[in-house]
């Protein structure tokens, strides 16, 4: 599924790493890197930023997904658990390529639109 998401974005040579964790594990990462002491559904750590950005040009970064949070949130999104995991993978990839939703409403709308379009495309093909 990750390869399919990347292909839909035209990133055929790109690589990501995916880590599936529980709420406690993602809370520790959220506190350490974003100073938010609570679990979240997905975290993205881009490799195209910082001192190691040129180390491996095809490596977009790391995506961490809390399976527990995904399960809890799936009903709110009208999805089954796998659908929610796919949505969070898309969300994480969009963050890795520069989309954001913090702050500006326009950025959040663009990201939500792109996320919805990608989700529809990749889930129609499976």
Regions found by a protein language model. Give the residues of each.
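An acidic/histidine-cluster motif and surrounding catalytic segment
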Residues: 1-86, 93-126
């Amino acid at each position: 599924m990750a390869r399919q998401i990347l292909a839909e974005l035209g990133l055929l040579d790109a690589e990501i790493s995916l880590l599936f964790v529980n709420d406690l594990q993602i809370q520790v990462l959220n506190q350490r890197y974003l100073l938010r002491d609570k679990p979240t559904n997905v975290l993205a750590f881009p490799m195209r930023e910082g001192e190691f950005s040129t180390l491996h040009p095809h490596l977009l970064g790391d995506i961490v997904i809390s399976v527990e949070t995904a399960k809890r949130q799936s009903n709110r999104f009208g999805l089954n658990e796998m659908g929610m995991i796919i949505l969070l993978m898309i969300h994480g990839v969009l963050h890795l390529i520069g989309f954001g939703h913090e702050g500006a409403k326009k950025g959040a709308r663009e990201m939500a639109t792109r996320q919805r379009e990608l989700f529809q495309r990749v889930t129609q093909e499976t």
